[in-house]
UniProtKB/Swiss-Prot annotation:
Gene Ontology cellular component annotations, sorted alphabetically: plasma membrane
Basic and acidic residues bias spans: 64-76
Stated role: Putative antitoxin component of a possible type II toxin-antitoxin (TA) system. The cognate toxin is VapC10.
CDD domains: RHH_CopG_NikR-like
Chain spans, region Disordered: 64-85
Protein name, entry field: Putative antitoxin VapB10
Gene Ontology biological process terms from the UniProt entry: regulation of DNA-templated transcription
Organism superkingdom: Bacteria
Keywords: Toxin-antitoxin system
Amino acid sequence: MKRTNIYLDEEQTASLDKLAAQEGVSRAELIRLLLNRALTTAGDDLASDLQAINDSFGTLRHLDPPVRRSGGREQHLAQVWRATS
């Protein structure tokens, strides 16, 4: 184990101490537990984000799609196409 010093504000310290007391562990042990949880679940965010996207499909099916009209966007894209071709 390596020693690391960090600076915490008063609110963070109080919250950690309260949670540590509830869990029956020291502040240092709680910080280690929280770090381990954050580090081991870091990749899960992508999976949960993708699941949320998949779950959202079809939720707005009752809405009519917006009407697309020609306008500045098409002209801009045509200019970009000509400039890069």
